[in-house]
Amino acid sequence: MRIAKKWIRNNLMKHSSIGGANMRYFKNYCLFIVITLLLTGCAGVETKKSPSNSKLTIESYNMSEKETLLISKTGVEQIEFFKLNGTLKEDDDLQFSVEVFENGKFKEELLKTWDELETKYNDSLISFGIIDNRDEDHSLKLLNGIPSGLATTFYSNNMTTSSFGLLIDEKMTLEKNKPIYLTAWLGTTKNELRSGGGTTGELPLGIEEAELAIIYKVLWTDKEKK
């Protein structure tokens, strides 16, 4: 930048005898160069800062009436969408999965996806939905919508009462290696069941009372070495 300023000062002195019109042209040209250099410098600083200040956020996506109507035509009774924003570093990864609990105890992990193809998220949508096939084959169809596609599986279900709810109520910043739980489906064969909702991305309180719990989570972590 000092070299650019010195070049401009020398040329201004050298061309002090130039006519008014030419001088105005020369000043405008110099101003253009200075602005270009400043913008380039600012861009360079921003580029250097972004890798060390990685930030990933997630928040619930509120569907419009039209979107809700369209979803209702697909047969998906319960579904929630979320918006992702931020950039992953080269050695980072986002994992999406569903955790299953029986009587409050962890049983297994389903629909786990990792090694995300996308690394930059700008209002990128993810979702988790459930189709209850209780009247057909007593199963739940689980839908895991991720930035790069859709994963599905079936899970046996003999619950007679269930609830489905969000586990976050505002934009949340992901912390590395700390899962955020986004939605919870709770089921029981009893007549009563506590709501499975929450606000802070933690496991719901009603999980211990539910005979079956299916929880959707996202985890920011290191990329698994192949």
Range-by-range predicted roles:
Residues 2-22:
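Short, Lys/Arg-enriched N-terminal segments with co-localized hydrophobic residues
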Residues 21-30:
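Bacterial N-terminal signal peptides that target proteins for export
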Residues 38-41:
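C-terminal motif of bacterial Sec signal peptides marking the signal peptidase cleavage site
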Residues 44-103:
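Short N-terminal edge-element motif at the start of the domain
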Residues 103-110:
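Short aromatic-acidic-glycine turn motif
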Residues 111-226:
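Extracytoplasmic electrostatic interaction patches
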